[in-house]
Every structure is written in C-alpha cells, then in structure tokens.
Amino acid sequence: MTILFQLALAALVILSFVMVIGVPVAYASPQDWDRSKQLIFLGSGLWIALVLVVGVLNFFVV
C-alpha cells in the first residue's frame, strides 16, 4: 500500500509541475485554443482525481 501511495504522490507532483508550466503557455499561445482548452480541462480533472486518491491512500498508510 505504501508503494502505491508513493507512486500516486509522485504522479501528483509531476502533473503539478507540468500544469504549472503548461497552463500559462496554453493561455499565452494564440493558435489552437480548442485543443489547449481540452488539455487544460483534462489535466485539471486528472489533478483533482490524484488529489483525492492521495488523500484516500494517506488515510490507509498513516
């Protein structure tokens, strides 16, 4: 269970770094807004899911 928690936490940290760089770039680029908007919403949904998963796994690990 601990390894699963660590993997989920690592995925959350990596996705957070990607979103910190990717979202401002997507907002600043004038072309292909529809594709960028879908990627931002997909990344945001995945980020929220990972936060919930890490929270639940933290309950079981600690």
Curated annotation (Swiss-Prot):
This is Photosystem II reaction center protein Z. Residues 1-4, 59-62 are lumenal. The chain crosses the membrane at residues 5-25, 37-58. InterPro entries: PSII_PsbZ, PSII_PsbZ_sf. The keyword Transmembrane helix applies. GO terms for cellular component: photosystem II reaction center; plasma membrane-derived thylakoid membrane. Keywords: Formylation, Membrane, Photosynthesis, Photosystem II, Reaction center, Thylakoid, Transmembrane, Transmembrane helix. GO terms for biological process: photosynthesis; photosystem II stabilization. Disruption phenotype: Cells grow normally under all light regimes tested; it is dispensable for photoautotrophic growth. The deletion strain is more tolerant to photoinhibition, while isolated PSII complex contains less PsbK and Psb30/Ycf12 than wild-type and also has reduced oxygen-evolving capacity. It comes from Thermosynechococcus vestitus (strain NIES-2133 / IAM M-273 / BP-1). Coiled coil: none annotated. It is a multi-pass membrane protein. Residues 26-36 are cytoplasmic. May control the interaction of photosystem II (PSII) cores with the light-harvesting antenna, regulates electron flow through the 2 photosystem reaction centers. PSII is a light-driven water plastoquinone oxidoreductase, using light energy to abstract electrons from H(2)O, generating a proton gradient subsequently used for ATP formation. May also aid in binding of PsbK, Psb30/Ycf12 and the oxygen-evolving complex to PSII, at least in vitro. PSII is composed of 1 copy each of membrane proteins PsbA, PsbB, PsbC, PsbD, PsbE, PsbF, PsbH, PsbI, PsbJ, PsbK, PsbL, PsbM, PsbT, PsbX, PsbY, PsbZ, Psb30/Ycf12, peripheral proteins PsbO, CyanoQ (PsbQ), PsbU, PsbV and a large number of cofactors. It forms dimeric complexes. Part of a photosystem II (PSII) assembly intermediate complex PSII-I; crystallized from a strain deleted of psbJ, it forms monomeric PSII before addition of the oxygen evolving complex. PSII-I includes 3 assembly factors not found in mature PSII (Psb27, Psb28 and Psb34). The modification N-formylmethionine is found at M1. PSII binds multiple chlorophylls, carotenoids and specific lipids. The keyword Transmembrane applies. Belongs to the PsbZ family. Pfam families: Ycf9.
